[in-house]
């Protein structure tokens, strides 16, 4: 009798243990954070491209993508870490926070944080709002907002391309949103980000018009690069950023 009872008890415990660990596993999944953190400054890190170097062919060539990400973007990240070595308090902040509060950054390193922090934030967004087999017309809330603001997608593209073409030297063309969802087009020099000068101008789309972004394929034909770039815009990612802008 005791032997039978012992066997039943062992069988019962054997059934309960896997169930217990399964419940623990599920609770851990449910507790996982859903929001992506801002870019860390302790240390700053270069994430891999979300697609292959050749994935944006024929509009952006693989060699340009490799050099742009692995050399140019990597240099911005390395420079941030080198600059902040002597500033442990600043390492506790995100790179996003540093570039939006440049007046609080020590003057001795302010320009370096502006240039390299901006370069890191700008390029991180740039890789995310492009994708293979993307392009086409906008979708979702962004499509409606573009039509309401600019009249049509074609009119918007014309104004955006002009902002990129007219930017003398190096810089960026941007589509920004305020917290109410109002859109506007702007451009910045060098690696400046719109949030550096206007905390209510959240970038949801940006095109890099530095020569390193296009010169290997397009040489001095920036206008052609600007036109072809629309074939790789990831409108799903742009819509996500548009929603984020209104939650700021």
From Swiss-Prot:
Catalytic activity, EC: 1.15.1.1
Alphabetically ordered keywords of this record: Manganese, Metal-binding, Oxidoreductase, Signal
SUPFAM superfamilies: Fe,Mn superoxide dismutase (SOD), C-terminal domain, Fe,Mn superoxide dismutase (SOD), N-terminal domain
Superkingdom classification of source: Bacteria
A Gene Ontology cellular-component term: cytoplasm
Reactions catalysed according to its record: 2 superoxide + 2 H(+) = H2O2 + O2
Names of the cofactor(s): Mn(2+)
Disulfide-bond pairs as recorded: none
Gene3D superfamilies to which the protein is assigned, alphabetical: Fe,Mn superoxide dismutase (SOD) domain, Iron/manganese superoxide dismutase, C-terminal domain
Conditions for induction: Constitutively expressed.
Residue positions binding Mn(2+): 68, 123, 208, 212
GO molecular function, one term: metal ion binding
UniProt remark on cofactor binding: Binds 1 Mn(2+) ion per subunit.
The protein's enzyme class: oxidoreductase
Signal peptide segment: 1-41
Similarity comment text for this entry: Belongs to the iron/manganese superoxide dismutase family.
Functional note: Destroys superoxide anion radicals which are normally produced within the cells and which are toxic to biological systems.
PANTHER family in the record: 37S RIBOSOMAL PROTEIN S26, MITOCHONDRIAL, SMALL RIBOSOMAL SUBUNIT PROTEIN MS42
Assembly description: Homodimer.
Full protein name: Superoxide dismutase [Mn] 1
